[in-house]
Curated annotation (Swiss-Prot):
Belongs to the PhzF family. This is Phenazine biosynthesis-like domain-containing protein 2. Gene3D superfamilies: Diaminopimelate Epimerase, Chain A, domain 1. Its EC number is 5.1.-.-. Pfam families: PhzC-PhzF (PF02567).
Length: 288
């Protein structure tokens, strides 16, 4: 088996920042177990598999492809940064001639369009609903101790718990916060929660680049202690902060050690555009 494989840093214009994803281009069907084996070998938060939908398709000329995402532990239903990385590989390395690519995925058809300053992902919007604190108190306290919480929301579509920290906290607090993810899967083992999102409101002003909100994302339930930059969580962070701030266009920053920037646009048709850059840092051949 020889497969072309790449690593691209997503949601950044600088190598070794953003979120790295492996991208594997499949000329033909891959054995089902091989997807997970490769993802485990790559040992990144996500490995994407881009496949031709028809035998006559071509990675340079075609505009529709199948796309699946795997963490080192399991297949995942939606991944923004690995979708961005996949589009970047097709645009930059396979010189795809189309301005917009369509990916057929577990979460429906997702589009990625090329712009001068990045790639725009066309994703669904996922609503969040108020979550009773007492139902998740043990989980939250295990993760962040006595850190003050302002709001808690739950997304049944993505199984993410969104925890907004007090507005008294800023970016530096979120960046330095020690989050204990190790006990979380044992505390919440019903399958209701697969991801924990912490978020704070952005600054009202200042000399540095402004962001409307900041976040960090943790998914130990699927083998990812902290995800560096998570495009898919902005399908719920976007609408949440849009309602809170009264804005449709926002700029977001994910405060992991690597960090990453995302431009968010809530569209009238109920979908969200998520734009970011991508840098391909590795190209090779999987030979196993």
């Amino acid at each position: 088996m020889k497969l072309p494989i790449f690593i691209a840093d997503a949601f950044t214009a600088t190598a070794f920042r953003g979120n790295p994803a492996a991208v594997c281009l499949l000329e033909r069907t891959l054995d089902e177990d091989a997807h997970q084996d490769i993802a485990r070998e790559m040992n990144l938060s996500e490995t994407a598999f881009v496949r031709k939908l028809q035998p006559t398709d071509d990675f340079t000329q075609s505009s529709r492809f199948g796309l699946r995402w795997f963490t080192p532990e399991a297949e995942f239903p939606l991944c923004g940064h690995a979708t961005l990385a996949s589009a970047a590989v097709l645009f930059q390395k396979r010189k795809n001639t189309n301005s917009t690519l369509t990916f057929v995925t577990m979460s429906g058809e997702l589009k990625a369009r090329r712009e001068e300053d990045g790639i725009v992902l066309d994703f669904p919007v996922y609503p969040t609903f108020p979550q009773d604190f007492h139902e998740v108190e043990d989980l939250i306290k295990a993760a962040i101790g006595d850190t003050l919480v302002q709001d808690i929301r739950y997304s049944p579509d993505t199984k993410n718990l969104l925890v907004r920290l007090s507005d008294s906290y800023d970016r530096s607090f979120l960046e330095s916060l020690k989050v204990n993810t190790e006990p979380l899967p044992a505390i919440e083992k019903t399958g209701k929660v697969r991801g924990l999102i912490l978020t704070v409101k952005g600054e009202p002003g200042g000399q540095t680049a402004l962001y409307d909100f900041y976040s960090r994302c943790f998914a130990p339930w699927v083998g990812v202690a902290e995800d560096p930059v998570t495009g898919s969580t902005h399908t719920l962070l976007g609408p949440y902060w849009s309602e809170e701030l009264g804005k449709k266009e926002m700029r977001a920053f994910q405060c992991s050690r690597r960090g990453g920037e995302l431009d968010i646009n809530l569209r009238p048709d109920g979908r969200v555009d998520i734009k970011g850059g991508a840098v391909i840092v590795l190209e090779g051949t999987l030979t196993a």
